[in-house]
């Protein structure tokens, strides 16, 4: 982003003197009174656990969540979202540059099972995969052995699609509950994976099948919610203990205002479904925070699918991506207001399933 684009956004340093940035300020256009005098620009300030300015690297972002995602090895359900307006960088945050994440077919990243390209633009998903395999390997000395499997799906117009299925596959994907009440999806492919390279191949396959379209806000916009799931089943051959963790890494479709985008036909329907599901996500988080007797998980496929990971037994983190463009200032403010509400919610204390003899904590 250029300096002119960022002129309406400031990142004040935390006042406690540690140099961290935990606030963001946005400035609207100069307000003119009825007499023609300037009233100054309207200011909006929001406080969060952490704010990343434009110069922050992908590694800076991942370091903030690295302990959180690793706790899946400890038997926790972990959920990481990227939320924001279309074109604000959610997919870059979660995946990085498409070719940098997985390489093209036959590239060195595909042939080397332990390799992630070293250009620094890899996102949360490939960095998480690398860390999980490295950490699980280091736990072998303590007797732990892990079986990892991955799935990748998208929710498009309230319909679930398996991004790892062969093109043309015509199966119905229903959300179901097992005897213990845990959520699963029928017919979804789970690939057992033994190294990062295998996961990167799956990511590349999924990216080619995801629903993309040009919009007025973004020439290459994701029109679906994508959900990458990594299932981690561990067993300690010395103690007999077991651990079952799940990682949900989610790139939410971009929110848009119909009046501003002027969508018609299929694009209009897509936007309506996207906005409704994002609204349902906010409703669920609010209900959890208010300790409501009824949590409206089933109001959308997204919240229904993530019921296990949104509830109080999970660890959940949301990235909010903000566009630097002046014309999207109002949408950015709306995103930050939603994020502030989410940040104020306490949905309970996470509980793990199983027992691993090391501890991690979320930030």
Which residues make up each language-model segment?
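Short polar catalytic/cofactor-binding loops
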Residues: 1-2
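Conserved GTP-binding G-domain of TRAFAC-class P-loop NTPases and closely related GTPase folds
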Residues: 181-194, 198, 202, 312-316, ...
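Short, loop-centered acidic/histidine patches that primarily coordinate divalent metals
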Residues: 29, 321-322
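P-loop NTPase motor catalytic core
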Residues: 15-309, 313, 332
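Short, cationic low-complexity segments
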Residues: 11-20, 341-343, 347
